[in-house]
Amino acid sequence: HTFVDLKSPFTLSNYLSFSSSKRRQPPSLFTVRASDSDFEAAVVAGKVPEAPPVPPTPASPAGTPVVPSLPIQRRPRRNRRSPALRSAFQETTLSPANFVYPLFIHEGEEDTPIGAMPGCYRLGWRHGLLEEVAKARDVGVNSVVLFPKIPDALKTPTGDEAYNEDGLVPRSIRLLKDKYPDLIIYTDVALDPYSSDGHDGIVREDGVIMNDETVHQLCKQAVAQARAGADVVSPSDMMDGRVGAMRVALDAEGFQHVSIMSYTAKYASSFYGPFREALDSNPRFGDKKTYQMNPANYREALTEMREDESEGADILLVKPGLPYLDIIRLLRDNSPLPIAAYQVSGEYSMIKAGGALKMIDEEKVMMESLLCLRRAGADIILTYFALQAARTLCGEKR
């Protein structure tokens, strides 16, 4: 209705009468618009264009008391009253780029379901692994971390298979890099998948976990992974001094570009059970409390943080995630380095179980838990929900 037929003499009155008419005629091929000054003159003359009326005040339910407005200056709810405002003022965001996808691999061809972790599998390294990575990349997840299920026959007290350059992890890294050169591959550096004792280090006759001898083995493992093409090696063993020794070993072999993500604050948690089932890596005796941190301790995380920083760590990780939000925030507030959080198998399985029993909304709880880890200060999150959450973020539920 802002067009005037050039066959008729153009006047403002003609225009206004045309605008208010109910006729539905298509405009002629050649049309002109009234000028801004014409519109302004019409408004000044009192010919105000029609617009929707002022909306009525919404009715309150019957029985609502009539009270004076509270004498308060700030009403935080004003900034929450619409989706657009809530989105504009959102302080924390979540993106598929924030996720590192943990993948279990094994020597077989079949993808084997993990009973305690619904939706997770031990992937065949030749095919299942490539297919799962392709799915993740399709929704923006381009970082993975590999965890191997090692045959019992290859496990030894000193975990020598950990640095076999033709072993399962180095082979898988080479395969992935050949197919997806830009994929970021994190690796786990620890002896427990390779140890006949199921511990992260070499076990002495009296049950003591040997620190320095274990670090020697871990350095060889990290170098083997770097040589295969790993982008980030991630010592999860909690041995003292391993980050510095690993940095020296990597640099000596020409891998100055390979990063170290240290499991800085890895707690001796009960949330790891499903993971150990997935890898068949439960300790054959005892527990891991002499090297993993006491869940009761807070300040100790600062000690570990300072050591890892001074030894050359590039990323600091907290494990588990959601029960240790205070530790994530502690590291975030005291270190300039990137912070990672590991949403571990127990956290994942609890959400899955609650969802399956219809006790919670699985998708909403999943997304809230990940957002909370980000809000606490995590730059990246290792999560078994990586693919599912990324699909949700992309609006693609499959």
Curated annotation (Swiss-Prot):
Keywords: Allosteric enzyme, Chlorophyll biosynthesis, Chloroplast, Heme biosynthesis, Lyase, Magnesium, Metal-binding, Plastid, Porphyrin biosynthesis, Transit peptide. Its main location: plastid. Pathway: Porphyrin-containing compound metabolism; protoporphyrin-IX biosynthesis; coproporphyrinogen-III from 5-aminolevulinate: step 1/4. Its cofactor is Mg(2+). It is found in: Plastid, Chloroplast. Residues 48-87 are annotated as: Disordered. 5-aminolevulinate 2 binds at residues 345, 384. It catalyses: 2 5-aminolevulinate = porphobilinogen + 2 H2O + H(+). One of its GO terms (biological process) is chlorophyll biosynthetic process. Residues 60-69 have a biased composition (Low complexity). Pfam families: ALAD. Binds 2 magnesium ions per monomer. The first magnesium ion is required for catalysis. The second functions as allosteric activator. One of its GO terms (molecular function) is porphobilinogen synthase activity. This is Delta-aminolevulinic acid dehydratase, chloroplastic. Belongs to the ALAD family. Catalyzes an early step in the biosynthesis of tetrapyrroles. Binds two molecules of 5-aminolevulinate per subunit, each at a distinct site, and catalyzes their condensation to form porphobilinogen. The active site is at 266 (schiff-base intermediate with substrate), 319 (schiff-base intermediate with substrate).
